[in-house]
Amino acid sequence: MASHLIDFLLIGNNFGTPEMRAVWSEQNRLTRQVDVEIALALAEGDLGVIPQDAASTIASHANASALNIEEIAQDAVRMKHSLMPTIAAIQRQCGEAGEYIHYGVTTQDVVDTATVLQLRQAFDIVVRDTRLVAIELKRLAKKHQHTLMTGRTHGMQALPTTFGFKLAVWLDEFVRHLQRLNEIRERVLVGNINGAIGTYASFGELGPEIERHTLTRLGLNTPNIGWQSARDRFSEYASVTVLISGTLGKIGNELYNLMRTEINEIEEPFSEGKIGSTTMPHKRNPAALEGLASLTAPLFKSAALIHESMKVEHERDAMSWRAEWIALPEINIYLSAQLQNALGILRGMSVNEKQMRANLDLQNGLLLSEKVMFEIGKLLGKQTAHHLVYECSMAAFEQNREFKALLLEHPVLSQHLTADTLDTWLDPANYVGSAPQKVDEVIRYADGTGLLAE
């Protein structure tokens, strides 16, 4: 019976994906540990450290899918050790050749390297889905390059912008996330096969070569020196997941706000039969957006646990190590849910362009006060213009009147304005700056990196 929300049948997919849960499942953990033991045996057989026929037998007979996890778990309770029962089970599968299982390595060598194998699987999923989200953002940014909407600062209406510009900001972030993932891959996907305290003493002179051969077989990079007490690789990966999750959480929160009834500029995908409330039949709640935004906080907390694991006692200890066992699966599973959720939202959300345009007019023209100020400033000076336009702006607020009318009535400003001139200045379409051009620039840059290519 599942005891963590991640694995609940009813709501588990709110917190992770089946694909990512499979990567961090107990069975896959065991499988990757067996993979390490096989690769080690083959490397040692090739180098003459153990008999070649024993290595071949281990490779052909060690089978994680045939191991009984429940029996191994019972032995773990008795032995008070996390790996020895697995080694014993593999030994039984291999007969006499089993004497050469786990030859020279320590538990952490196998567990850490197996964890990196799992992380490689997770890494590929994260890269794939991060790229897919970036592709959707690129598509939407171009589609809405000229879609006018209100830009808001401090929660209040500020200036006109375009929805495509907002999306391009997010796209640019995602390109940087892909660049980060690309950069850290070589540093993070590194195995560790060097004995009890990392000195290769149990392997003899062939130690570094055994490590290199083993890790090459596994498709992992070889460290310059053992990293049992240097956990920065996992911490760096966690840091990048934090950045990706942070952007996803921000997107979820922003779209959540734009979906508010009073703003009504977008709506997350809606399907027949979707229920918003058990008591209010009319509700079309932003459930997917809430889910997207909500996972950032727990991911941040789990990532912090990985950062804390960088503090290691002497050459190694299990206190920090075990925290990674908890947190690495969590950050990847949470992130997988966020990425898949974001994909569904971006692919299916509705954009209410009509309401976006209507919201530009909510303040009776005040959204263009900056435009008026700078135009008047060319004649009277910026500071004087700010003072005079401020007077009209506050009067528009307090009297609930049209900004244009107050400008035309102002004893000083009216001398420099005409109704036709104000109509041009107060048209939001004429004051989006370089927003459309920046959308194209971001898309060109994204395409130029090659990171969005299939």
From Swiss-Prot:
EC number: 4.3.2.-
Any one annotated GO CC term: cytosol
Record: residues binding fumarate: 106-107, 233, 278, 283-285
First-level EC class: lyase
SMART domains documented for this protein: ADSL_C
Source superkingdom: Bacteria
Sorted UniProt keywords: Amino-acid biosynthesis, Cysteine biosynthesis, Lyase
Active site (catalytic residues): 154 (proton donor/acceptor), 277 (proton donor/acceptor)
Pathway named in the protein's UniProt entry: Amino-acid biosynthesis; L-cysteine biosynthesis
An example Gene Ontology molecular-function term: (S)-2-(5-amino-1-(5-phospho-D-ribosyl)imidazole-4-carboxamido) succinate lyase (fumarate-forming) activity
A Pfam family annotated for this UniProt entry: ADSL_C
Reaction it catalyzes: N-acetyl-S-(2-succino)-L-cysteine = N-acetyl-L-cysteine + fumarate
Alphabetical GO biological process terms: 'de novo' AMP biosynthetic process; cysteine biosynthetic process
Keyword DNA repair attributed: no
Family per similarity comment: Belongs to the lyase 1 family.
Function: Catalyzes the cleavage of N-acetyl-S-(2-succino)cysteine into fumarate and N-acetylcysteine. Is involved in a S-(2-succino)cysteine (2SC) degradation pathway that allows the bacterium to recover cysteine from 2SC and to detoxify 2SC that may be a toxic metabolite. Can also perform the reverse reaction in vitro, and has minor activity against 2SC and other small molecule thiols.
Further information: Is able to complement a B.subtilis yxeK mutant in the ability to use 2SC as a sulfur source for growth.
Protein name: N-acetyl-S-(2-succino)cysteine lyase
Lineage of the species this protein comes from: Bacteria, Pseudomonadati, Pseudomonadota, Gammaproteobacteria, Enterobacterales
